[in-house]
């Protein structure tokens, strides 16, 4: 491209684009953001915009497309969603007041994790940028929501733990570097999280520069002041993240006032499969909140509370005292109905303190934001009063952390108009009486406008022109309009300004003088109001940390009040929490399913587990009878209790659980070349290698993805391993392998349960009741009948079932198959196959090794 032939504006565009090659450049030209050349082609295709052209000095016109500046957020959001980084290049001076090319600068780079515009954010979700790094012996992770200023950092020991943290926080973007050990697992992270990933230069993560950045940002003398003195990996991740944010925001990060350094062991660990299978924040079927646990429990009244509710459900506590403090707070709120209702009414009037503070710190808050902040602050005294009367140490603590913020309230109340516009550059923001100089200017312009408004009547009377009128437009300013039929009556002091088809427009020296006074005064008023507003905003910025502290406390009050509200409405009870190993639930219910039962009542069930005599519950019964629901509901009850919520049952005792694992259902991962069975075995290996004696494990139909004997072998060995003294994790194991039920008499800690079914006239009725003992029937044909399978097929299936059960028919086998080896697999006599299975150390076996072992077992079976 011959740059010397380009127009000055296009040279400016290309020079800017050269600095932001990896971004779509939105270049401000008047009332539009324009894109040129390749960017224009890309954007016109992605957003279905018209592709035009612009003369640029070259022989061919430059491809061009544009979007209105006032609607840019909508288009930027769509581009970011499609995986593009967007650089916004703004006009830095008034085009009408400068000579030559207008000065332009990139004022912000927008990426998935750095969005600050409220119109592009979901109010009930955090928008986290995550930063990860490591050296193979451990990893650092930091994450921040730039729109709220919330910032966190931690260290983890291995990649599995890092993946769990990433899933838990659900970031919108991840940054790392090629020099990190994380880079070797980048494909695994991408597949596991499906989050946009940005690789940065290694210099971002250098310990010295990262530490220096943190010390400057948080104004501390050493890392001890922010809790990172012995966490260098977390320090590097956090420093790199803040550097990246500074680079994209192009301004100081005033909303990031503190960093919360946490230990991952302080909360229950939930992996991706568990969050998905228990439908904690969204449903498996259509990925919506309705139908999930969050959909039932989230009756919060603020956006801050709703975001925190999601965090609490993904990170239940695993220490007795903090859990009890939350439960005591919920109890106090539940018992005092009047206070609870008053608190909820206060919260309904509270806007998003966090994001309002973020907008003030970033300089993007407008007059509407200020009045929203003032109105939110106005209810804090009543909120504090209601909290002070409740018997709860946690609520007392939160009440003390809510600052009245009176100075901010008074500052806004005195200065900002009640009904101010969204824009801050066109006046109408500052209250009368706040500035004498501003009021004086407004008075002078008022007098001039009154003179102008009375001019048409006085001129009609003076000239005798009955249809004379005074008007205004942006191009010609004020004018006096006279129709053609009255030209002969026009006075000599009228100066022609514009000719129309049927009229002439004039100006007089007096009108011109008043016009100058009005327009100059308007510009001065707008400028003065803008400067006063910015001054007020800067003054409030000094209170950002106080606002954020109040936001954190109000959000917690909102979640606790929501827990109390839902518990009262649904008849939940306060669980007992201790450090023992017992989980006991009397008449437990599934909190979500019971909400969707239109007719009838949800069938409640009991649960009792401990590590000594009932660590393994083997659950048999037909499909659709309720095995999975029973297991899920008990896992959810544990999760709810440790999150601090009351639970759906008549009584409940829970010995703290450190992790919940679920292996429920499976499907092929075709993109990764993995079969259903491989996915199932990978998940099982992960659980067996990660569980502790304080874990709760939910296993549904282990081994069904392969042949009967292979599957039974794996299920059998898994039960034995989980009941071994080495682990003894509390486990619920649903299976159709009825052969496993004999283990109740052989291994201490195994208890058989089954789902009760009633048979009437060849039909079955699912009672959904869990009872002691085992069942030897799966009722598969009955379930097929309920599903609408053709009668002819069902009759044939019933005949075949009778033959198989009587032993009159045997599966077709080759002459070379040695059935005795399979039939004696679990006999009291030793067999090579059983020895092989027993020799496998599942704690040390990787998924790939497990697959090879399974292949060897299969070869033995087929000999």
Question: Which residue ranges define each predicted feature?
Answer:
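Hydrophobic alpha-helical segments characteristic of transmembrane helices
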Residues: 344-347, 353, 371-374, 548-556, ...
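Short, amphipathic C-terminal "tail helix"
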Residues: 366-369, 843-863
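Extended, charged coiled-coil "arm/hinge" scaffolds of SMC/Rad50-like chromosome-maintenance ATPases
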Residues: 500, 504-538
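ATPase nucleotide-binding head domains, primarily ABC-like/P-loop NTPase cores
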Residues: 37-40, 231, 301-302, 306, ...
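Charged catalytic and DNA/RNA-contacting regions of genome-maintenance
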Residues: 2-332, 348-361, 365-457, 584
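Active-site phosphate-binding and catalytic loops of NTP-dependent enzymes
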Residues: 89, 112-121, 252, 388-394, ...
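Conserved phosphate-binding elements of NTP-dependent enzyme cores
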Residues: 2-3, 11-15, 22, 537, ...
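Amphipathic heptad-repeat alpha-helical coiled-coil/stalk segments that mediate oligomerization
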Residues: 205-212, 268-272, 284, 375-450, ...
């Amino acid at each position: 491209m011959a740059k010397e032939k380009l127009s000055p504006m296009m040279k400016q565009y290309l020079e800017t684009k050269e600095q932001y090659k990896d971004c779509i450049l939105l270049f401000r030209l008047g009332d539009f953001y324009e894109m040129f050349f390749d960017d224009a082609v890309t954007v016109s295709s992605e957003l279905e915009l018209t592709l035009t052209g612009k003369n640029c000095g070259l022989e061919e016109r430059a491809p061009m497309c544009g979007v209105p500046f006032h609607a840019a957020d909508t288009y930027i959001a769509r581009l970011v969603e499609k995986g593009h980084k967007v650089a916004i290049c703004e006009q830095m001076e008034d085009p009408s007041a400068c000579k030559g090319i207008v000065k332009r600068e990139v004022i912000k780079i927008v990426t998935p994790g750095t969005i600050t515009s409220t119109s592009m954010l979901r109010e009930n979700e955090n928008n986290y940028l995550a930063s990860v790094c490591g050296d193979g012996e451990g990893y650092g992770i930091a994450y921040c929501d730039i729109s709220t200023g919330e910032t966190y950092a931690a260290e983890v020991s291995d990649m599995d733990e890092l993946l769990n943290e990433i899933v838990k926080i659900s970031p919108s973007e991840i940054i790392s570097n090629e020099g990190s050990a994380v880079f070797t697992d980048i494909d695994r992270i991408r597949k596991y999280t499906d989050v946009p990933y940005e690789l940065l230069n290694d210099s971002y993560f250098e310990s010295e520069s990262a530490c220096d950045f943190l010390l400057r940002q948080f104004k501390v003398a050493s890392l001890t002041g922010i809790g990172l003195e012995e966490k260098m990996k977390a320090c590097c991740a956090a420093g790199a993240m803040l550097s990246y944010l500074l680079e994209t925001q192009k301004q100081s990060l005033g909303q990031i006032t503190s960093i919360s350094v946490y230990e991952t062991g302080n909360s229950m660990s939930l992996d991706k499969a568990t969050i998905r299978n228990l439908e904690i924040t969204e449903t498996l079927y259509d990925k919506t909140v309705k139908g999930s646990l969050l959909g039932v429990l989230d009756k919060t009244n603020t956006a801050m509370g709703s975001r925190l509710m999601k965090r609490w459900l993904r990170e239940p506590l695993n220490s007795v005292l903090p859990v009890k403090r939350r439960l005591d707070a919920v109890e106090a709120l539940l018992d005092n109905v009047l206070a609870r209702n008053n608190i909820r009414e206060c919260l309904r009037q509270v806007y998003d303190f966090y994001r309002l503070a973020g907008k003030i710190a970033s300089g993007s808050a407008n007059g509407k934001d200020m009045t929203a902040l003032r109105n939110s602050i106005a209810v804090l005294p009543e909120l504090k009063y209601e909290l002070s009367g409740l018997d709860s140490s946690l609520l007392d603590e939160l009440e003390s952390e809510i600052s009245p913020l009176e100075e901010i309230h008074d500052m806004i109340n005195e200065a900002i108009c009640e009904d101010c516009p969204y824009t801050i550059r066109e006046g109408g923001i500052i209250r009368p009486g706040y500035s004498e100089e501003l009021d004086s200017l407004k008075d002078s312009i008022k007098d001039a406008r009154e003179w102008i408004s009375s001019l048409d009547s006085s001129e009609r009377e003076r000239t005798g022109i009955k249809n004379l009128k005074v008007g205004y437009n942006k191009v010609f300013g004020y004018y006096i309009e006279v129709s053609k039929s009255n030209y002969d009556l026009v006075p000599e002091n009228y100066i022609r300004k514009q000719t129309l088809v049927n009229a002439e427009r004039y100006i007089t020296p007096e009108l011109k003088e008043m016009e100058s006074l009005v327009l100059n005064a308007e510009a001065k008023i707008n400028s003065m109001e803008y400067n006063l507003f910015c001054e007020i905003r800067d003054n409030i910025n000094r209170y950002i940390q106080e606002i954020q502290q109040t936001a954190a406390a109000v959000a917690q009050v909102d979640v606790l009040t929501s827990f109390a509200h839902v518990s009262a409405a649904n008849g939940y009870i306060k669980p007992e929490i201790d450090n023992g190993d017992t989980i006991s639930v009397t008449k437990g219910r599934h909190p979500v399913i019971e909400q969707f039962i239109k007719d009838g009542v949800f069938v409640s069930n009991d649960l009792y587990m401990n590590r000594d005599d009932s660590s393994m519950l083997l659950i048999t019964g037909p499909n659709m009878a309720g095995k999975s629901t029973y297991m899920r509901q008990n896992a959810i009850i544990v999760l709810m209790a440790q999150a601090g919520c009351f639970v759906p049952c008549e009584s409940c005792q829970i010995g703290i659980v450190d992790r919940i694992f679920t292996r429920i259902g499976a499907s092929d991962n075709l993109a990764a070349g993995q079969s259903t069975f491989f996915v199932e075995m990978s998940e099982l290996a992960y659980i067996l290698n990660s569980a502790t004696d304080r874990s709760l494990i939910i296993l549904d139909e282990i081994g069904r993805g392969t042949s009967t004997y292979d599957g039974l072998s794996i299920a059998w060995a898994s039960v034995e391993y989980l009941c071994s003294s080495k682990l003894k994790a509390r486990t619920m194991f649903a299976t159709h392998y009825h052969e496993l039920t004999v283990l109740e008499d052989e291994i201490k800690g195994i208890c058989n349960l089954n789902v009760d079914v009633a048979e009437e006239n060849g039909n079955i009725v699912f009672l959904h009741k869990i009872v002691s003992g085992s069942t030897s029937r799966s009722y598969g044909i009955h379930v097929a009948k309920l599903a609408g399978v053709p009668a002819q097929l069902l009759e044939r299936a019933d005949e075949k079932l009778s033959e198989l059960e009587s032993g009159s028919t045997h599966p077709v086998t080759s002459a070379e198959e040695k059935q005795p080896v399979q039939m004696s697999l679990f006999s009291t006599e030793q067999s090579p196959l059983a020895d092989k299975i027993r020799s496998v150390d599942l704690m040390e076996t990787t998924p790939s090794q497990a697959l090879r072992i399974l292949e060897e077992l299969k070869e033995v079976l087929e000999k």
